[in-house]
């Protein structure tokens, strides 16, 4: 069961199902009651935490997802596809293009509206969803496509984490921040002490790590920095192999519980009974910037990166059709974009709801466009592979020289 939930296809399917169910239920007669329940608060006075149920998911449970993202980032930088400048160059430039162009598209559409603060929303790529769509529709494509998408999404996540840390930190409490930093350092020390431990000693180390992680989360939340940054810092703090083991253990919970719950709670939005002309500019900015901005930005960045790489004597990246396909997958914002919308439009409930709908619409357009393109590319790749296999079989079965001489290749 856990191996099934780890599947990229299943993870993407659960995310999509949860979002659809949340959106549908929110617009039924049960919707108002469910929305009121989701916005109800659950307080822990002893530690000074008072969050709505939505925020317990986005500020609490989602930390697990960001911990796993940080572990994957660290692995890619130390031993994966980003462990050298030459390997990281093209996806890095493509990732920058995939952030800058959507932000510019959004700002161009919302200029003068007072809603420019939402520019980070269309800059994110949902790594789990994008890889899931690729796994479903991209069979037979070169392995380099998945490697490039993974590197691109990892770098995109790194930029998104930086945006959250820099632009969504308010009222910094230096005392709480000091506790959070101390917690991360202690987490790193305990993590290294746990290397090679077995039995009761290993259980004790894991229990201590969980306790330190909870304290670090509380201190980060109290400091004014978004709590998901705690997950990022803790993920980077663990030794690489220990982090990979921890991420592997947490992945079923993240894919099967955390991400679907977040998608469900974020999609609990009542569709406004207004005309298209009455929608806020932020809606159009996000809905267009995700599929269109990402397509243009990643493609242009990838082509620029390939040119720079060739000038340096390195490999030039993907073929243009595959780069366009990856660019469409990059337009699937979903998880991180939904979080960005929640943060950017805090206090503007109507705009936040429209932002959520725009993320769902823009990501949906990107999913459909990517699925169609992947299906076409995949069909051609499988056909080319079958033709090559037939050609090889013909050469083996019918040598050019029947007299025992060498067959001609």
Swiss-Prot record:
Annotated transmembrane regions: 10-30, 60-80, 89-109, 118-138, 148-168, 171-191, 203-223, 224-244, 257-277, 283-303, 328-348, 356-376
Topology in membrane: Multi-pass membrane protein
Single biological process term from Gene Ontology: regulation of pH
Region Disordered: start-end pairs: 384-409
Keywords: Antiport, Cell membrane, Ion transport, Membrane, Sodium, Sodium transport, Transmembrane, Transmembrane helix, Transport
Localization per record: Cell membrane
Primary location recorded for the protein, binned into one broad class: membrane
Record-level GO cellular component terms: plasma membrane
Database matches in Pfam families: Na_H_antiport_1
UniProt keyword Transmembrane present: yes
Catalytic activity: Na(+)(in) + 2 H(+)(out) = Na(+)(out) + 2 H(+)(in)
Family, as annotated: Belongs to the NhaA Na(+)/H(+) (TC 2.A.33) antiporter family.
Protein name: Na(+)/H(+) antiporter NhaA 2
Native source organism of the sequence: Clavibacter michiganensis subsp. michiganensis (strain NCPPB 382)
